[in-house]
């Protein structure tokens, strides 16, 4: 659950218990955006929830890139990268089907209203390099992946650090190339060289590894 929804008394009570933080969007920062600071390190007055992070049995991050940013800000030794994320078996089977489909020689661009997803820069890149592109959007997960996977390349230039980036991993699982910047955690994982079925199998392994890690920490 999102611990920001907890009351102060509930958070205080948890500090004496055995709990894990599955870190996602830099909740130790007031603005949640480490990109605003040099080397992603915020000044002390920009940190929040520090004691809650300190008292955790473990802070699980989604990539080594993500874990390093958290470590540089909090200087804690209870931080660990799980090196991936979780997809349902149903989603992985769907990605398997989409990986086998023929793809157009064009770029997929996520058409997002969220400013830090930086859709305009991806569009400008495609236009400047004379690449065909398709804007992909929608709330239906399957339909969105079908739009995405119809192309052979994802173009994505986020403005803030992506702890992993599900869209990048999903694109690789569908056998696509990825054009991005240095703000995507997934691209710095050793398994990122994999794509298609090989990467899908790696994420299947994560479905076993991550829960086993959590159970081990809580036992």
For each of these PLM feature ranges, what is it?
Residues 11-17, 50-55, 101, 170:
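Short, conserved loop/helix-junction motifs that constitute active-site signature segments
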Residues 86-144:
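Conserved catalytic-core segment of nucleotide-activated headgroup transferases in glycan assembly
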Residues 5, 27, 65-67, 185:
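Alpha-helix capping/helix-boundary segments
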Residues 1-11, 18-22, 155-156:
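Short N-terminal targeting/anchoring amphipathic segment
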Residues 37-59, 68, 149:
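Membrane-proximal helix-turn-helix segments that form the acceptor-binding/catalytic region
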Residues 149-219:
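Catalytic binding pocket for nucleotide-activated donors in carbohydrate/polymer assembly enzymes
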Residues 14-43:
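Active-site proximal beta-strand in glycosyltransferases
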Residues 54-78, 118:
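A short, active-site helix/loop in glycosyltransferases that binds the activated sugar's phosphate group
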């Amino acid at each position: 659950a999102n611990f920001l929804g907890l009351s102060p008394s509930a958070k205080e009570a948890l500090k004496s218990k055995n709990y894990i933080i599955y870190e996602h969007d830099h909740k130790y920062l007031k603005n949640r955006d480490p990109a605003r600071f040099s080397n992603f390190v915020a000044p002390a007055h920009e940190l929040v929830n520090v004691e809650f992070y300190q008292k955790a049995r473990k802070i699980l991050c989604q990539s080594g890139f993500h874990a390093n940013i958290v470590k540089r800000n909090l200087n804690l030794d209870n931080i660990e990268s799980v090196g991936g994320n979780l997809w349902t078996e149903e989603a992985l089977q769907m990605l398997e089907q989409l990986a086998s489909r023929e793809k157009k020689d064009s770029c997929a661009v996520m058409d997002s209203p969220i400013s830090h997803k930086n859709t305009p820069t991806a569009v400008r890149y495609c236009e400047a390099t004379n690449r065909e592109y398709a804007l992909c959007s929608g709330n239906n997960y399957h339909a969105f992946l079908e739009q995405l996977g119809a192309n052979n390349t994802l173009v994505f230039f986020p403005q803030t650090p992506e702890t992993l980036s599900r869209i990048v991993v999903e694109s690789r699982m569908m056998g696509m190339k990825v054009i991005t910047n240095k703000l995507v955690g997934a691209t710095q994982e050793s398994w990122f060289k994999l794509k298609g079925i090989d990467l899908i199998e790696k994420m299947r392994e994560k479905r076993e590894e991550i829960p086993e890690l959590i159970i081990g920490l809580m036992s």
